[in-house]
Every structure is written in C-alpha cells, then in structure tokens.
C-alpha cells in the first residue's frame, strides 16, 4: 500500500521557553556580560541546573529599511527546546551554555511551555548585571481565543434568532388562515407578499445610496491623507519654500549653542590634598612635587636616581622601564619577609624582598645605572678643569653635606630601598629592602 510523506520545508515552530526572555541594553553579546552559571533557580534540582540561552534576533521595518533591534535570549534546560539534541557546550551560533557547579550533563526532561501558559519571571542566585534586563511577559494568547469563541457564540445566537422568528410567524399565520375563510386568506397573503417585496426594494435602494455616498467620502479621505503624507515628506512642494522653512530652524539651533553657558575650566573638580597630608609611602613625585619634596634628599639609604630622576620623578624618561622591574604589593607581602617593630605610638614595618633578573632584560641596565647615580653625577661634575678659589671649594663641601644621612623631622615616615647590584653568575641579583619606620623616637 502506498504511503504519502511530506518533506521538511525548513520552517519549524520554535518551542516556547518556560521563562521570560533576557535582553542586553548595549551592543555586547550576552556571553560577554552574563556569567556562565546564570541558570534560573525556579525549577529543577541541583543536578538539573544546566541549559542554554537561545538568541531570538529581532528587527523592525521602517520606511522600507530593516532596523535591527536588541535580541531576546530565551532559556531552555539541557535536552529541551530548539537545540534539545545538542550535547552540553556544543559550539553553536546564537547559543550561550550555562550551568551551575555540580549539575549533570544529562537531559533534564523539564520540558517547555504551552502556548496558553504565561512565562515565568526567572530568578537567579546572583544579581544580574545592570545592562541585562528581564522582558516582561505579554498576555497569553488564550485570552484572544476566548474572545473569538465568545464572538462566534454571539454570531450563532444571531443566526438562530431569524429561524425562530420565521417558525413563530408561520405557526401564527397558519392558525389565522384556519380561523378565516380560504378566499380572504389568499387575498391577504397576496397583499402581504406585495408589501414585503416593496419593503425589500426600498431597503436595497437605501443601502445602495448609502454605499455610494460612503464610497465617495472614503475615496476623498484617502486622497487627502495621501496628499498630507506627501507634503510631510516634502514631495509636491515648492523647494524654495521648503528651504525657507528649514533656515529658521538651523539658525535657532546655531543660536542655541551660543547662548549655552560654557564650563569654567578654572574650577577644580576636587580639592587637591597638601603633600604633607599624604603618607610618604603613598606620595607620587610629579610636577611641582619633586623626589626631594616627597622623600627627602638623596644620601645614605636613599640612593636611587640621578639629577633628572630627582627633579622630574615619575615623568623622567626611562621611569616606566625601570618601574617594570619593581615588585608589586603582592610580591612584597607574600614573596618576601615582613618585619614589624612596635614603637611608642606607631609601628616600624620592614619589607625585605629579593629577586633575580636576567642580564638579557633590556631594562635591567637602566635600573642599575640609577643606583647611587647622584654620587656618580657629582663625580662627573668635578672632572671639569676650572680654577676654583678656596671660598668656592668651601661652599661646595657644604653643598655636598646635604646628601649625608642627617636627621629628618620627627613626624616623617621613611621608606628604605637598597639595591644590591652584585653579579651572581649570568644574572643580576637585585635585593629590595623596604623599611617604613618612625624617627620620632
């Protein structure tokens, strides 16, 4: 016996998700803004907290042009929905896989939603990002079906009523005919038929007249509406008049920019703190705040930086390359030794960290050249062959005394960095001792 089979046309009805969809308010895809464990917690046990978000591409036609709209993302549990036959994390366009820790990668059999059911608002174990919103569900289509059934019911009642009236009239007419003689009944029937025919003709004429009037009115309204639409688009108008109408608008917009008060650049957005109010280990030497102003003069254990570095601080050329070899906070805390000594009203904290840098590193020579650079710089200046009198020599000795480790104000906290540039094998061993202490005692 022959059988009939139909091939798949390529369009299928997508199963409905149990939950209301998500929508991203910016241009990023959902996988870039949503965590990979964002599974709704409304249904299923801990083994079934696994599934995928399926993209529904949206657009709108405006004046014959397709305008893209933000996509809706619908959630389906693993083994359900339009991609129910895919294994977990199978790379598929428009699919974002999510799962909670401990979930099994097996079909959940939690099913999908019926068309008459309302979508569930999804709940999550963590707060959604600010750029992700839940699309509120619309009224289910069941209400429209109910309204159609009611309208059909009313139509059936209306169609039934004429038949009932006809039955009643016929029975009443039969009883009257039986009560009167046959001749008189026949004449009455003929007269009634003539009256009915006249009434039906009058009604049909009235309908035709009203239709003619309505057709003219609707045609005029349509022509007027088309004319208004063309005028709004600038079609059929005098182009010079259209330009004159646009000129005042442009002048208005240009003048509005002139009257807008401009920002006063001299106003400071935030009040800058004085250097003395900032702890020494948080100061950044730049601009007017030189290295000497932030950390004191070079000398003793403060032995890093030449004249340019001391003057410009972090703005000096080569600082970024050297800073790449300085340890970060985590390295100081977890990779070195931290010693704490209690003082009268403070703590003295010493950080001791050692690191090995290959000689092949292009920045290590630049760092080594800055160690004790202020001493080397003074020596180079002394090579100049110039005659100096005794008075200038005495002044120079006094100036060099600035670099000695003299006493600092008692309320200043110091940071000590020592660089041991001893060569060990093929690498340069750099030892960093970072001491923060109070000299008040």
From Swiss-Prot:
Query: What is the native source organism of this protein?
Result: Porcine epidemic diarrhea virus (strain CV777)
Pfam hit, one: CoV_nucleocap
From the UniProt record, which GO molecular function terms apply? Answer: RNA binding
Per UniProt, which keywords does this protein have? Answer: ADP-ribosylation, Host Golgi apparatus, Phosphoprotein, Ribonucleoprotein, RNA-binding, Transcription, Transcription regulation, Viral nucleoprotein, Virion
- Please give the PROSITE patterns that the UniProt record associates with this protein: COV_N_CTD, COV_N_NTD
Q: Where is this region: Dimerization?
A: 277-379
The family annotation for this protein states: Belongs to the alphacoronavirus nucleocapsid protein family.
The annotated region (RNA-binding) lies at 16-146
Gene encoding this chain?
N
Describe, as the record does, how this protein assembles with itself and its partners. Answer: Homooligomer. Both monomeric and oligomeric forms interact with RNA. Interacts with protein M. Interacts with NSP3; this interaction serves to tether the genome to the newly translated replicase-transcriptase complex at a very early stage of infection. Interacts with host RSAD2; this interaction inhibits viral replication.
Q: Specify the protein name.
A: Nucleoprotein
- Which SUPFAM superfamilies does UniProt cross-reference here? Coronavirus RNA-binding domain, Nucleocapsid protein dimerization domain
